């Protein structure tokens, strides 16, 4: 972990000290809500959340045009948030970054990064916040639902672009190492199973 020469109080109790040259900025100033609906039926196959990824739904009734036209259109690198039923403490992995363009139910939040921000950095940051159940405390209503209207009021930690790139590269590297280990263990288990 990098040690910086000087730190400042973030003003956020759970966050504590941050490097002096990092900023805290309102989410609404760096992320834009994606609201484009699929009214022209440009896309005919909706996507869904699955363990922190966005995948195409396996079973789709493409004749249900009315539901397809109400889906939001997301683009590659948009960030999707499942803000539904936050009061159920499941490990749902509510954050995903789109690897392709497509459509998804408008019940989810889709955001697009503006200048000076890496979508991969925001995804990692939001996944870290999700793992600590930070989003659970932001929901409203009986079923604790998070909306962009509520999300945009909060702040995001914003290091300079080069540091965002370094953070993403480090986390990508570590994630790949973990995935390699998992694959290795699965292969070993499979060999034991066959014997």
Where do the protein language model's features map onto the residues?
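A short beta-sheet element
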Residues: 72-131, 147-148
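A short glycine-rich beta-alpha junction/loop motif
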Residues: 6-10, 102-107, 140-165
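DNA target-recognition patches
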Residues: 7, 28-65
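Non-catalytic DNA-recognition/assembly elements of restriction-modification systems
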Residues: 6-38, 153, 161-165, 173-180, ...
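A structural connector/turn signal
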Residues: 63, 68-69, 141, 153
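Short amphipathic alpha-helical coupling segments at ligand-binding clamshell hinges
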Residues: 121-125, 170, 181
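Residue-level recognition of short, solvent-exposed, well-ordered loop/turn junctions
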Residues: 23, 57, 63, 69, ...
């Amino acid at each position: 972990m990098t040690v910086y020469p000087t730190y400042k109080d973030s003003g956020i109790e759970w966050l504590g000290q941050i490097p002096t040259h990092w900023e805290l900025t309102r989410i609404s100033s760096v992320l834009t809500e994606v609201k484009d609906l699929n009214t022209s039926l440009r896309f005919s196959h909706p996507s869904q959340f699955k363990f922190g990824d966005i995948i195409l739904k396996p079973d789709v009734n493409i004749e249900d045009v009315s539901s397809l036209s109400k889906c939001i259109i997301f683009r590659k690198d948009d960030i999707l948030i499942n803000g539904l039923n936050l009061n159920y403490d499941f490990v749902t992995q509510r954050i995903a970054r789109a690897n392709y363009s497509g459509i998804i139910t408008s019940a989810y939040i889709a955001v697009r990064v503006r200048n000076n921000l890496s979508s991969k950095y925001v995804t990692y940051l939001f996944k870290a916040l999700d793992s600590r159940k930070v989003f659970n405390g932001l929901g409203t209503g009986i079923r604790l639902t998070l909306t962009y209207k509520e999300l945009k009021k909060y702040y995001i930690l914003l290091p300079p672009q080069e540091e965002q790139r370094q953070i993403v590269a480090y986390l990508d590297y570590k994630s790949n190492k973990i995935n390699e280990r998992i694959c290795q263990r699965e292969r070993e288990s499979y060999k034991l199973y066959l014997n």
